[in-house]
Amino acid sequence: MNPLIIKLGGVLLDSEEALERLFTALVAYRQEHQRPLVIVHGGGCLVDELMKKLSLPVVKKNGLRVTPADQIDIITGALAGSANKTLLSWAKKHDINAVGLCLGDGDSTTVTQLDESLGFVGKAEAGSPALLNTLLSAGYLPVVSSIGITAQGDLMNVNADQAATALAQTLGADLILLSDVSGILDGKGQRIAEMTAEKAEQLIAQGIITDGMIVKVNAALDAARALGRPVDIASWRHAEQLPALFSGVAIGTRILA
């Protein structure tokens, strides 16, 4: 069975209650299914908190964090360090054998600078599946942070939705993007069950989909096109529905290729 990549985002990493719900759902799913799982995460909320403590500015451009040279080491520490190891500690509490990685490990993705005006922000593309396949076949749960490394050895902050997309391409995996919201909402605040590229463009033009959600929707559309299969955007808040989601039941918005 092809692997399933679960991308974690939003305030989930900052909430013990949310992490307890998520890992309880993961344990329940793993007990019933032999499907290999990979977790991909960012940690924007943790980075924002750290920047505030250090009195450093937080600048975002089109939903992407501007990452100057004097901030990339701090962001790497927050994402590949604190956020990643927090998730490993929760896995350990739930007797899940996890391995903490970044996008650069085993050349699992190829990362290049996205746009000079954004600083050390990278774009990830599919790389080698060898390391991840070795870990998955041995029963490990890879937990991958969205820090990448270029061919020149530069650390890059990669949008976690886009990072998860690249890893899904690497592994030929299905992809679920978990966030704070229950899916994509229309102008009346109602969840949209299915979304096409045409519908997304229409809602962006109308100003209904904005900022970080534009990045998320575009990443999901890119993934759906690249993988040739739907991608789900859903909330981690409904823990009782997560095992069904992991089994292919749409509980949020299903992005169609």
UniProtKB/Swiss-Prot annotation:
Binding site for ATP: 180-185, 208-210
Taxonomic source organism: Pectobacterium atrosepticum (strain SCRI 1043 / ATCC BAA-672)
Pfam families documented for this protein: AA_kinase (PF00696)
Entry keyword annotation includes Cell division: no
Subunit structure: Homodimer.
Family note: Belongs to the acetylglutamate kinase family. ArgB subfamily.
Residue positions binding substrate: 43-44, 65, 157
CDD domains tied to this protein: AAK_NAGK-NC
Keywords attached to this entry: Amino-acid biosynthesis, Arginine biosynthesis, ATP-binding, Cytoplasm, Kinase, Nucleotide-binding, Transferase
UniProt name for this protein: Acetylglutamate kinase
Highest rank taxon of the organism: Bacteria
Biochemical pathway: Amino-acid biosynthesis; L-arginine biosynthesis; N(2)-acetyl-L-ornithine from L-glutamate: step 2/4
Entry function: Catalyzes the ATP-dependent phosphorylation of N-acetyl-L-glutamate.
UniProt main location, coarse: cytoplasm
GO CC annotation: cytoplasm
EC class name: transferase
Gene3D superfamilies: Acetylglutamate kinase-like
Cell location: Cytoplasm
Biological process according to GO: arginine biosynthetic process via ornithine; L-arginine biosynthetic process
GO terms assigned for molecular function: acetylglutamate kinase activity; ATP binding
Reaction(s) catalysed by this chain's protein: N-acetyl-L-glutamate + ATP = N-acetyl-L-glutamyl 5-phosphate + ADP
EC number: 2.7.2.8
Site entry (Transition state stabilizer), positions: 7, 216
Chain ranges passing through the membrane: none
InterPro entries, A to Z: AceGlu_kinase-like_sf, AcgluKinase_fam, ArgB, Asp/Glu/Uridylate_kinase, NAGK-NC
